[in-house]
Curated annotation (Swiss-Prot):
Main localisation: host cell
Natural source organism: Cucumber mosaic virus (strain Pepo) (CMV)
Family recorded in the similarity comment: Belongs to the cucumovirus movement protein family.
Biased composition, class Low complexity, residue ranges: 254-268
Region (Disordered): 247-279
Record's keyword terms, sorted: Host cell junction, Transport, Viral movement protein
Record-level GO BP terms: transport of virus in host, cell to cell
Subcellular location: Host cell junction, Host plasmodesma
Lineage: Viruses, Riboviria, Orthornavirae, Kitrinoviricota, Alsuviricetes
Protein name (record): Movement protein
Length: 279
């Protein structure tokens, strides 16, 4: 399809002509499987001593090649205005520790461009998390769109880099990182405002919180009291022990003695405290 009409029309025609084909490339069963196995999209990545540095591209190599070929073929025949760009609005990483807080170690997480041989953080977007800071949520926002090209033998795209430091004596998994993002592809690139990487420390989930509420405690005590013989908590019609003090005596408030035969004396004689079985 050749370009015709205004710029707005061209954009609409390009999107309509390419959306179905891109959908097939991005959401085929093979592409979905590659996103999970090669990129760890939505999966927990374990940081171990034998995997101290992890570089996870945001697009699988096979999928990258197919998308790049698609845009290149459209560009070569004049149907697309570029060879394609990759944009990622945000990368969100949930980081949790899997060792005790007294373990001395840290994680360094940042977003990189595979076109950079040094794998430097993009615009300084780098976050360091000590073990006792975890759990935490880390957010990255790229400041440019990545061209779909090959640099040397590397497929250029964004990647999440995780470095493990310290943790002497801990050879197993010390932290788990679960990353989520949504990659977008277009023949036009975007302009962005520079935003620093964000870090939000998260309070650990209290599994016993439900048992520490007053209602839960009351129910627990009531169930325990009900398991004991009720005779220990129900008063019979026997005369009350004279050692029991009234509330006025506990407050050291002296009341004048009531005359025998008075209405107040009869009310006092008729009063009997009651104890409810349980709470």
């Amino acid at each position: 399809m050749a370009f015709q009409g205004t710029s707005r029309t061209l954009t609409q025609q390009s999107s309509a002509a390419t959306s179905d084909d891109l959908q097939k490339i991005l959401f085929s069963p093979e592409a979905i499987k590659k996103m999970a196995t090669e990129c760890d999209l939505g999966r927990h990545h374990w940081m171990r001593a034998d995997n101290a540095i992890s570089v996870r591209p945001l697009v699988p190599e096979v999928t990258h090649g197919r998308i790049a070929s698609f845009f290149k073929s459209g560009y070569d025949v004049g149907e697309l205005c570029s060879k394609g760009y990759m944009s990622v609005p945000q990368v969100l990483c949930a980081v949790t520790r899997t060792v005790s807080t007294d373990a001395e170690g840290s994680l360094r997480i940042y977003l990189a461009d595979l076109g950079d041989k040094e794998l430097s953080p993009i615009d300084g977007q780098c976050v360091s998390l000590h073990n006792h800071d975890l759990p935490a949520l880390v957010s990255f926002q790229p400041t440019y769109d990545c061209p779909m090209e090959t640099v040397g033998n590397r497929k250029r795209c964004f990647a999440v880099v995780i470095e493990r430091h310290g943790y002497i004596g801990y050879t197993g998994t010390t932290a788990s990182v679960c990353s989520n993002w949504q990659a977008r592809f277009s023949s036009k690139n975007n302009n962005y405002t520079h935003i620093a990487a964000g870090k939000t420390l998260v309070l650990p989930f209290n599994r016993l919180a439900e048992q520490t509420k007053p209602s839960a405690v009351a129910r627990l005590l009531k169930s325990q009291l009900n398991n004991i013989e009720s005779s220990q908590y129900l008063l019979t019609n026997v005369k009350i022990n004279q050692n029991a003090r009234s509330e006025s005596e506990e407050l050291n408030v002296e009341s004048p003695p009531a005359a025998i035969g008075s209405s107040s004396a009869s009310r006092s004689e008729a009063f009997r405290p009651q104890v409810v079985n349980g709470l």
